[in-house]
Amino acid sequence: STIPTNLPEYKIIIPTQTDKDKSISDSAKFYLVTCAPGAAVYERFGHSGIRVHDSVKGIDEVFHWGLFSFDTPNFIGRFIAGNTDYEMGVYTTKFFMLQYIERGSSVYAQELDLTTEQKHELYTKLWNNYRPENRKYRYNFIFDNCATRPYQLIISTYNYKISTNTQQEQITYRDIINKYVPIGLPL
């Protein structure tokens, strides 16, 4: 799911750190945040992000890849055709959580078991993703979205190599999705 960017101006959050101070303490904690689905079309599949909480530096932010604008010309047509550009955002955790509390959706956080070096590496990667030239991307329902972006950053930070069992039954993405999405999903 995503959060529209055309919210009232007072709700738009500016990152709390300047370019000169994008550092964390060694005691910072990182969480994979998963939000339950909501009723709106853009909420139907939930949302994900990465929370950084550092009480020493006063940081408590969620990095997420779910911003878009309904004001985009032909938004619905572009969305259906797979031509929608999304953007990464950085919100205070309080504001991020408020979005889901207001709509009655659950939010789950799983702490990532990172070494001190990995914490600093992931934080650098997050801010690099937020650079103006990196924050926009072409949304893809399967391959490039608010779940795959944090996944790729986390996996690359852990330096994991993931292998799959190639002996499994051949199944299409459509087969997988049809198990979870009712026919005639009200959009």
How should these model regions be labeled?
Residues 2-187:
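Soluble extramembrane regions of membrane proteins in the secretory/endomembrane system
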